Amino acid sequence: MSSRPANNQGPPNLPARDKSLVQRFMAVAKSLQFAWFTGHSVVLISSILYLLKMSEFYYRSAYLGVIESFGIIIYQQFFTRNEPLQTQDAAATKASIKSRVAGLLKSEDVLYLVLANFWLFTPRFSFSLIPFFAFAVFHVLIYVEKVLLPKVFHLSSKDSSKILSFIDKFVVQYNDLCMHWVGTAELLIFILVLFRAILCFQRSWIILVVYAIFIKLRYENSKYMKAAFAQWRVRMDGIISHPSIPPFVKRAYNAIKMSLIRLSEYRLSGAPQVTKKQN
């Protein structure tokens, strides 16, 4: 899943048993990882409130939460782990800058951060919140399980805590499946964006171009998006092959399919890194 907290950026060690609940919470709240968790919590709560009230305030608040959480994880990944540039010689500095830029261009977190900023400053499109809501659900649950409950409430044994056991089983069972759903949802969002452009909604063509680039980059770097495309292709092939489908529709479909296959051969994010696990 995208936007995971860095392992070395967690909150302080477990407070002493004699400290109050407030003191233990404040110790955890001082960490950068807690700010990351807060961002995802804002996304989760704002999305639910937006679904209930359809208020623009909650829509924009959700994307501010996305920007906070993804911005923090990008900061952790690219700006806190490397040797400071000012301590390197010229050649090492140049190589370090190139490495950071290449990493930023291929980062899924950067991609989602850019997209969130785009959705924030364009007309509301409610379906666009679905992937970010899904991310927020699992990130909030993981943080509650790994940090809040054990470090603040001293619930650390899955055998004795039904809450921890439930969260752990839920995340293990549905995390990977949810990422497949996100890939499918993003393709559905693209179809909706395409129809909005055809119907000439406000800024719809700009949104279509930007989201098409997003889908292309996601396809290049995400196994879940590739799986979603493959699933859609199999289903569409079955529908189009039906004898009742007119020949001109079949020809048009095959032409579009072949064009997409050729397009997939061109990478916007550079050569794939085979040694890294895809997200």
From Swiss-Prot:
Signal peptide (residue range): none
Annotated source species: Saccharomyces cerevisiae (strain ATCC 204508 / S288c)
Keywords from UniProt, A to Z, are: Endoplasmic reticulum, Membrane, mRNA transport, Nuclear pore complex, Nucleus, Protein transport, Translocation, Transmembrane, Transmembrane helix, Transport
Q: What does this protein do?
A: Contributes to proper distribution and/or efficient assembly of nuclear pores. Required for normal pore density in the daughter nucleus during telophase.
What domain of life?
Answer: Eukaryota
User: What name goes with this protein?
Assistant: Pore membrane protein of 33 kDa
Q: Coding gene?
A: POM33
Gene Ontology cellular component? endoplasmic reticulum; endoplasmic reticulum membrane; nuclear envelope; nuclear outer membrane; nuclear pore
BP GO terms, sorted: endoplasmic reticulum tubular network organization; membrane organization; mRNA transport; nuclear pore localization; nuclear pore organization; protein transport
Task: Name the family.
Answer: Belongs to the PER33/POM33 family.
**Subunit record text:** Interacts with RTN1.
Q: How does it sit in the membrane?
A: Multi-pass membrane protein
Residue spans, topological domain Cytoplasmic: 53-56, 146-180, 222-279
Topological domains annotated Lumenal: 1-31, 80-124, 202-203
- Where is the protein situated, by its record's location annotation? Endoplasmic reticulum membrane; Nucleus, Nuclear pore complex
